[in-house]
Amino acid sequence: MNLNELKNDWINDFANPMIIAGPCSAESESQMLETARRLKESGAEISAFRAGIWKPRTKPNGFEGVGVIGLNWLKKVKEEYGFKTATEVANAHHVFAALEADVDILWIGARSTVNPFTVQEIAQALRGTNKPILVKNPVNPDLALWIGALERLLGQGIENVGAIHRGFSTYQKTKYRNIPNWQIALDFKNQFPNIPLFIDPSHICGNRTGLAGVAQEAFNVGYQGAIIESHEDPDNAWSDASQQITPEVLADMIGNLQIRNSGISGYEDEMGKHRTLISDMDFQLIELLSQRMKISEKIGTLKKENNIAIFQPERWKVITEYANQKASETGMSQEFIEKVFKAIHEESIEVQNGIMIDR
């Protein structure tokens, strides 16, 4: 059996879309129960209550989770409010403890997905389970690693799986905590339309303001669910406070989302995917142009300090020849590429002029 042959009927037992919500971290029994109570009373259709029991942190000495005791709090949430429960596992010990506590849904985090040894250890510990196991994309944009993690689960007989798109790390400063890079997620969806795909806007945005927009983009292209961080007192959360929202805000956000019929066929569904890719590429273009202009500023400063003219004909000749060559190789119109590079060059000259006259 391969991944394309999986039926993944498990998701049909949940609402569409399937929303998994709860705090980033389990902090105390009262915090868990209060968040669950407010989620229940908010009116939002929440399929499962999530909470991090063990927290892999970027740096040591941060809050790394309450550990096994938090599993008892998840049990109480299930008993008192009827939610299915979900948590992250990062090694065999976590798996055994979570299974013993009868956690309903487990996920493998982005930092684990990057390491095949870790994924293999987790997969072997999960062998034989019929619980849904979700896999977050790796922190780096590597589709093969993401697919490989799911294949390792399948290799251990685990057939109820799903994928979580949580964005990708970047050294550049952007409006996202983790850039969505929609193209990779949609490549995954195109290869495996049978595997439920969830959006994690909390980790993509890293803030509260962009959550709804990212979630809507995902549902526009047929994602089946979302995993969103919600806390009874977000400002005082012990981890990732800036990206968590109250249950009431979450309910309002979910209520305003437009859920697309994943069964739609034809040009509209395909067009939505293409437009999402174009939007992602446009964002990357703007980011690259911004970086290019910052480098132009540095060059302008050097020219000013060394009394060198802004316009360098030989350099411009090299740029245009290279651009025309690449246009020819890629089948693009040389006239179009010349217009683009002339516009970029003019803006670069304007930037450097500003440096020269201290504007």
Feature map (PLM): residue ranges:
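N-terminal amphipathic alpha-helix/helix-capping segment at the start of soluble metabolic enzymes
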Residues: 1-20, 76
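Active-site mouth loops of central-metabolism enzymes
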Residues: 17-34, 60-63, 83-89, 109-110, ...
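Hydrophobic faces of well-ordered beta-strands that scaffold small-molecule active sites
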Residues: 17-23, 47-51, 85-87, 106-108, ...
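Catalytic domains of carbohydrate-active enzymes, especially glycoside hydrolases
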Residues: 34-53, 101
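Glycine-rich, proline-tolerant flexible connector loops at the mouths of alpha/beta enzymes
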Residues: 50-68, 232-241, 299-310
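Catalytic beta/alpha-barrel core
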Residues: 64-66, 83-95, 104-118, 131-143, ...
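Catalytic alpha/beta core domains of metabolic enzymes, predominantly
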Residues: 118-252, 256-261, 265-266
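Extended, charge-rich alpha-helical interface modules
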Residues: 259-359
